[in-house]
Swiss-Prot record:
NCBIfam families: PRK05474.1, xylose_isom_A. This is Xylose isomerase. The lineage of its organism: Bacteria, Pseudomonadati, Pseudomonadota, Gammaproteobacteria, Pasteurellales. Homotetramer. Binds 2 magnesium ions per subunit.
Amino acid sequence: MTNYFDKIEKVKYEGADSTNPFAYKHYNANEVILGKTMAEHLRLAVCYWHTFCWNGNDMFGVGSLDRSWQKMSDPLAAAKQKADIAFEFLTKLGVPYYCFHDVDIAPEGNSYQEYVRNFNTIVDILEQKQAESGVKLLWGTANCFSNPRYMSGAATNPNPEIFTRAAAQVFNAMNATKRLGGENYVLWGGREGYETLLNTDLRREREQIGRFMQMVVEHKHKIGFSGTLLIEPKPQEPTKHQYDYDVATVYGFLKQFGLEKEIKVNIEANHATLAGHTFQHEIATAAALDILGSIDANRGDPQLGWDTDQFPNSVEENTLAIYEILKAGGLTTGGFNFDAKIRRQSINPYDLFHGHIGAIDVLALSLKRAAKMVEDHTLQNIVDQRYAGWNGELGQQILAGKSSLEALAQAAQNLDPNPVSGQQEYIENLVNGYIYR
């Protein structure tokens, strides 16, 4: 193992009273909550792209971060060093999983053949490092949006040859994900959308991406991949409008192409913000539609119209999110992947640890608070009582299709229904009592 982060041996749990900045205050991996350990509930992962690939650049300035592997003249040698340092970080942080795009781990090269050679070389290395460290792959994916060839989309591109190139990348990334024991495969349509309707055929592009997803499902079954396929919703950026706008939009797409039993969603907090939703809303919607798959844990800034990908730091927001997950039975193959990056001014390499440690503690404390809410059943009792009438004779007849509009119009003549309080203020006080105890 490399010793790039030589000031740290391993991040450990020291409890809430610890003042050690390189220790967990709330994340105790083996602590049992609602019958499962914290590690089993959260299934934490570090993302390769923001953590090991980003150099600190933005739209207004070049990279600000000093990363040795980004200075090497040989791209493949740089990728090998990056893998060494990545697994040092993962091991010292003590997380069980990581995630990657194909071109995060290996250089794309100057041809498809070179891309395949480079990718397979690094997959060999990752397979060995996983075996040595015990760190596993939560999910893999293909980057079909950064290369200029994808400026007009990948699956939705007007050129079928570019569609074909994207399919080839997904083919390789899916095969690698299976080989590495990945538990999910993610599809994020970074440029599957439009800049202007003036040059866009919406029906055609929808049919193209629908067929693309059907081919992905076909390949999953052909190679015997037992993991979960996930689409990651996002409303815009980099395109003006993206076709996977939010969870509800994705569900409508899946239904149209007969994929609702094959694909679930990977929900990112910042993408919910961009779509004008709360993180809790997107999770609750996915759970209600039976497509909740995995989580990209981060936060956005409601005052900014772009993806800031900051580390999550709100116990309130994440308690409500995890409460919805626990009510839905928890995550199965999914987990909490930190799709988050340090700030451009955070130039100390150890800032990577501070960002992840703080975020992990936020999720751990949020899990404790949400679990208590589930355990006490107080909130659920209020909801159950609110809808209790639907368990009665009238409600059951309506839901069972045994009543018509005409029959209900007749029944209404003998009714004098009265509304009851929604108790929102009381419920919000209850929730605050759990969060800030």
